[in-house]
Amino acid sequence: MYADVPEAKDFDDKEAAAIKARAVNLEKLQARLKVEKDKVVAAKLRQDAGRLTPVWSNGPHMNWNGMVAPIVGYSVRGTIWYQGESNANQPEAYKWVLGAMIKSWHKSWGQEFPFLIVQLPRFMARKPELAVEDDATWPRLRESMEWIADNIPGAMQSVNIDLGEEKDIHPKDKLPVGERLAYVALQRVYKTRTDGEAPRVKKAERQGDAFVLTYDRPVLLKNDGKGFALLGADDKWVFGQAKADGATVTVTGVKAPKEVRYAWANFPEVSVYSAGADSLPAGPYRSSK
């Protein structure tokens, strides 16, 4: 399936090789089980090997065959997708890989049902000394998720950038994740809510020594407006100072800034929220994408 998507071919080739290797290893491990009859070893073998997105596609040896294919044809209202952590090593390819998978699921059911993506929350060690974590892969993975929500029919996302644990890939507090998914569904699927999705940057423009970001609705700043960074003429990132006024956020901190970013780290500082009662967080942003 992914071989049909040129941007994902390299990813597909690597995953195909990995799948073949896993099949060989599985045969060896099964033989070992028969000899040892060790329950502890059996339990370890049953552990998920990483939950890469391709295992959910419709190829051989995939999770699709045992867990999704049996229910194809049954009524479906939508899907919730909370995956992607194991794909962080190829964040740009993720939009093509997951995008192709969503299309294949839609084709199997014969309908473009809602596909709600949980944009991944914060994870890994904080690096407060860095204005921008330029080599971080999770911000780019979150950006790919946003691209899918914008470009794949039926896809949409919830933003969870203010949640997460440094040392636990699964946030302990699950309630906000579920609530935000519900808000998105109520707005996009059931049409009973006006603002269920996170605020989005509509426009970013340099005005003198500042960058002005215009969001799609009024926002407010918490946490002293932290999380913004500006790229100076020397190509160095510096912390930005942010002020909100209605739907605009003005960021200053360096003369004639070249670019602006927000929440661009694996575990970023965050401050931008919708001004409504639900106070939904805005996701990561970069002006250079």
What are these regions (language model features)?
Residues M1-K289:
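Cell-envelope and extracellular/periplasmic
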